[in-house]
Amino acid sequence: ILSKNKDYKVPIKINIDLVENPDIAQTVIITCFGLGISCEITGLQTLKIKETDRLQAMKNELRKLGADVEITKNSLHLSPIEKINKNISINTYNDHRMAMAFSPLAMLVPITINNPEVVTKSYKNFWKDLKAINFNISG
């Protein structure tokens, strides 16, 4: 059973090396962004050779949302911002993880995911399952 410690506080900053688990990087980064947590994520050198250059793609799309983000050849640094830009279209770069990672931001601001069908590569029912937990999905 997992539960939150009663004294839990959202961290101000996290530093994490994902060299052994690079495929969770996009989810970790977007979670930090949505929660306003500064993060330094390292071990990301293989993200440049996935479906797309995931480091550059994350930087591009996060900046549309107003993020203060910098990348190197193997890391991403994200600083918290005051307000997330609304009604932004997120490009997926034909990468299923881009679509799935950015989708939960809809809990904070309306967003559009371009090329949403890309999720079928790994999670055919992704949009159906989001609807089941009360996400509004149109288009």
Residue ranges and their predicted role:
Residues I1-G139:
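Short, structured segments at the rim of ligand-binding sites
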